[in-house]
């Protein structure tokens, strides 16, 4: 069996620690439909809004939407070989991916904006990138070409290069759902919340460990209103096999690796992060669109 995600280079693992973040007066822009309020630098000259949740697709109605909440993901209800399964979108399972499926899916092969239910394991079927954001997204303005996917360089800039990058990212959980938290450029911590940057190394067999930051739904509502982004660890898909749900997060970039028919993605677990991982294009990963400011 081929391994979907072949490498995750430039890994960074940081022990549990706290870093203070100086409050900055937030921006007051007009927030696009379907977007979160924070602005995030993805290059020296470009800032973006993140969508309100991961991208989802319903084949039976040809409908695209953003997840209702940032912590929502489809996942699967069938355990993988490691015993991992999960998801909180009722009546939906990524294992059921097909052109007629009436549930929702949210793990897509690379560049499948024009063919979101493609589940072939033939690399050549994924040769041309079509951005998922080129489609009308029902709760994201519902017109074409409003949204796009970050490039590999933009993921890297966001997570590693922008001002205070390392102090504005960390793992955690929202009401038990694990994932990666990213803070906006201008950030004021809500008075009833806390945030600890970085990651926790696994201890013994306690893996994954998403307790680095823990939020109730009420606490997360305050964090989100202040601009925080949460990317759930929604796992991956190979054909109709879904794996590592709740253990890893894999988020596509729009950047191909033409020499190997792979593509770049942003990868994280509860204890590390890579902005420049790469893997086979046929492997299903999460998509979190952005809109340019």
Language-model features, listed with the residues they occupy:
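A short glycine-rich, aromatic-capped structural motif
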Residues: 37-126, 149, 153-159
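Intrinsic disorder/low-complexity segments enriched in polar/small residues
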Residues: 3, 19-20, 69-71
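Bacterial Sec-dependent N-terminal signal peptides
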Residues: 12-39, 289, 293
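Intrinsically disordered, low-complexity segments enriched in proline/serine/threonine
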Residues: 25-28, 118, 186, 192
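Bacterial N-terminal signal peptides
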Residues: 3-13
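Short, motif-level signal for alpha-helix interfacial/capping segments enriched in acidic residues
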Residues: 126-133
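C-terminal, surface-exposed recognition/capping segments
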Residues: 35-37, 44, 48, 52-59, ...
């Amino acid at each position: 069996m081929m391994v979907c995600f072949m490498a995750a280079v430039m890994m960074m693992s940081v022990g549990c620690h706290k870093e203070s973040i100086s409050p900055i007066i937030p921006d007051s822009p007009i927030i696009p439909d379907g977007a979160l309020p924070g602005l995030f630098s993805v290059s020296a000259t470009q800032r973006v809004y993140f969508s309100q949740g991961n991208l989802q697709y319903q084949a039976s109605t040809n409908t695209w939407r953003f997840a209702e909440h940032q912590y929502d993901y489809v996942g699967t209800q069938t355990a993988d070989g490691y015993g991992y399964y999960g998801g909180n979108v009722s009546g939906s399972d990524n294992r059921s991916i097909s052109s007629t499926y009436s549930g929702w899916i949210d793990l897509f092969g690379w560049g499948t904006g024009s063919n979101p239910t493609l589940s072939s394991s033939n690399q050549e079927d994924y040769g041309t990138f079509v951005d998922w954001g080129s489609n009308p997204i029902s709760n994201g303005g519902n017109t074409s070409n409003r949204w796009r996917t970050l490039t590999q360089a933009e993921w890297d800039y966001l997570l590693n290069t922008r001002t205070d990058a390392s102090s504005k990212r960390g793992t955690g959980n929202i009401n038990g759902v694990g994932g990666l938290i990213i803070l906006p450029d201008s950030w004021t911590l809500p008075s009833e919340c806390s945030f600890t940057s970085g990651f926790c190394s696994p201890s013994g067999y306690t893996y994954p460990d998403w307790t680095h930051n823990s939020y109730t739904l009420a606490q997360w509502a305050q964090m989100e209103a202040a601009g925080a982004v949460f990317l759930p660890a929604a796992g991956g898909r190979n054909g109709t096999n879904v794996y590592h749900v709740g253990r890893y997060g894999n988020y596509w970039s729009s950047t191909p690796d033409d020499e190997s028919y792979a593509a770049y993605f942003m990868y994280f677990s509860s204890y590390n992060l890579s902005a420049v991982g790469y893997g086979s294009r046929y492997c299903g990963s999460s998509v979190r669109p952005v809109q340019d400011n």
